[in-house]
A protein has these predicted regions:
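Solvent-exposed, polar/charged alpha-helical surfaces in well-ordered, non-transmembrane soluble domains
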Residues: 5-9, 51, 55-58, 62, ...
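Substrate-binding rim/cap in mid-to-C-terminal beta-strand-loop elements of soluble/periplasmic
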Residues: 92, 99-141, 205, 209-251, ...
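Structural recognition of the beta-strand scaffold that forms the well-ordered cores
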Residues: 23-28, 74-77, 160, 193-195, ...
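His/Asp/Glu-rich, glycine-adjacent segments
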Residues: 1-23, 30-37, 152-159
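Extracytoplasmic/secreted cell-surface and envelope-processing proteins
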Residues: 35-37, 84-88, 203-205, 232-234
Length: 273
């Protein structure tokens, strides 16, 4: 509710939409993320938040219609990620990592210690300890490659990618590596990315997360409303990076040539019908 109240306050305080220059108002209803992580997407708690957001968005649309008319604004609605269902609720093929995976990863640490005479190679997940690398006189890329081979043999691991591999840039024919590379930043990302088998939730205990390149962690809604948009549900593939070029096209704003994504054909009838 506070996010919606902030939207009304911003509309008034900054006179958004009062002239011919497009104004951008971006809202994030992040409560659903916190609830979803704790209780899962199929829980009554998540449903309660979704219904509340639906009401708040409906009220906001009514206010925008009142202020600017139905053709006086463009609106987009999406999410930044999907989510893995709670295995305890939906069952197979979804399952949670357990002692088998933990023991194997602990074995990787022991093997690296046996090879290089040092313990505690990983900090904060799959990031190699730079101080330990310097002490041992080893390069991160070489140790990461060793660790990747060891981790790839663990149960439930589909694939392991190193930071060096991602930095070189995967090809379009490798969709998993391509998806992971879009979340990779050399200065901030770990040295290893573990891609777990489909359905395996890499989280101990309770709750859920979105830490894979599988469709359930990536699929999000993409809704566009406004003048020039033909109503209907479209079946063709789209990506979240298409949203900015689409909004720009609807608003008549030029798009730089190097922007990722493409304007979606929202002005055409869905599926040609």
């Amino acid at each position: 509710e506070q996010v919606a109240l902030l939207a009304y306050e911003l509309l008034d305080r900054y006179a958004l939409g009062a002239d011919g220059v497009p104004d951008l108002l971006a809202l994030s209803f992040s409560t659903l993320d916190f609830i979803g992580h704790e209780y899962g997407p199929h829980s009554p708690e998540s449903l309660d938040v979704v219904l509340r957001i639906d009401r708040l968005v409906g009220d906001l649309l009514a206010e925008l219609d009142r202020r600017f008319g139905p053709d006086g604004y463009v609106l987009a609605f999406s999410a930044d990620h999907g989510v893995t269902p709670l295995p305890e609720r939906v069952g197979s093929p979804f399952r949670r990592v357990g002692s088998e995976q933990v023991r194997c990863l602990q074995g990787v640490e022991r093997e690296l210690a046996a090879r290089h005479g040092q313990r505690g190679w990983f900090i904060d997940g799959f990031t190699l300890d730079p101080a330990l690398l310097a002490k041992a006189g080893l390069e991160a890329e070489a140790v990461a490659a060793e660790a990747a081979t060891l981790i790839a043999a663990c149960p439930g691991v589909a694939r392991v990618l190193t930071a060096a591999e991602l930095a070189r840039g995967p090809g379009e024919d490798d969709p998993v590596a391509l998806a992971i590379s879009r979340s990779f930043r050399p200065e901030r990302s770990p040295d290893l990315f573990v891609h777990w088998e489909e359905g395996l939730l890499p989280l101990l205990g309770r709750g859920t997360t979105h830490a894979t390149a599988w469709q359930y962690d990536r699929r999000v809604p993409l809704v566009v409303l406004g003048p020039g948009v033909v109503p209907g549900r479209r079946a063709e593939p789209a990506a979240t990076v298409d949203l900015a070029p689409t909004l720009a096209a609807l608003l008549g704003v030029p798009v730089p040539a190097d922007v990722a994504g493409r304007p979606l054909p929202v002005g055409e009838p869905p599926n040609g019908g």
